[in-house]
């Protein structure tokens, strides 16, 4: 089960990047229960976009109405800051929407876990949900083995990278690069007063996402079930070679000058200043940040999303699909609700939604033509399914991610060792 505290912290960090950068510079009640009579063809749909100008879900509702004459979907947009608690309160009171935007995982208000545990969500039984949506994208949308929701789009926990700028300076980092390829180039870049990466080293969500991106290749690439092994006591952070490799990669990059000067004490403002001024080529964030930054720049900046170059073996992408749709168990229109949710992940709608969000369409059979320009560099990795679920999406305690993030800051300052960090993560996991 996922803990959305981590998810939301990561999304908030992603929003902070483009906003801070100089680049940007009561639902209608459905009530009741199903009956043998013809279902009502009017349903309610609530969502809470992080960006007030985001119309992706309202467009989805209009598309469904256009394709299904006689159906009416009443859309209710709620502020993202209060959406989760508002949804939880409405659902508990029996007057929640028929369809709702939902966060996968559990542990906070308005998520699959909390609403599923309370028996408030409509089970999704259509076999296509399992056959058409890869397991990596369905992660966190079931409760006790029953599917209750589906993701709306997928993002890469990525290196947001200015490839044009880097190449103009003679620097090459791409989907085939290894960590050694990066390390070899860092000293020359540093000598020019620049860095390959900008890092908010004092901010745990940023140091954390970077390190998990590396561990996706060193830990989860070879063993996709590592989290299950950790939960069952078969392994630990400290005993896993891949976790040592991931943290050693951070130490090596720091020594080679791959981060901007003062990275250990830097915050998001420093990161965005380095990126927007052309002093750094890339930073670490969910890939939806590419669209936000490009839109804010009026098209003057072109970025791509890359996975992190692995220090050992294949490069694996880290995917997260934490925002999706679910239905209300008390809806009077369960067939209509399930059909609308199924429609949301149809190829045409999934592609349209992803384009609006700057993300990747839901679904397992993607070709390069399905992807936005910023994903073309990783199109082959996606086609080859060379990816894993963002590891933290399966961690049950946010303290583990915080121990990683703060621990990496300690590595950067020299106040902690790799063993110190991994022992702290194990302690947080077992607490």
Predicted regions and their residues:
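Hinge/lid segment of periplasmic solute-binding proteins
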Residues: 105-157, 210, 298, 305
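Extracytoplasmic "Venus flytrap"/periplasmic binding protein-like
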Residues: 63, 67-133, 167-170, 275, ...
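C-terminal capping/gating helix-and-loop segments adjacent to ligand/active sites or protein-protein/ligand interfaces
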Residues: 357-364, 377-430
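Short, low-complexity disordered leader/linker segments with a strong preference
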Residues: 1-44, 66, 129, 427-431
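Short, well-ordered beta-strand elements
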Residues: 38-50, 71-76, 98-99, 148, ...
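Extracytoplasmic/periplasmic substrate-recognition and gating elements
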Residues: 66, 294-357, 416
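Glycine-centered hinge/linker elements that transmit conformational signals in sensory
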Residues: 230-263
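Extracytoplasmic/periplasmic solute-binding protein
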Residues: 148-151, 183-235
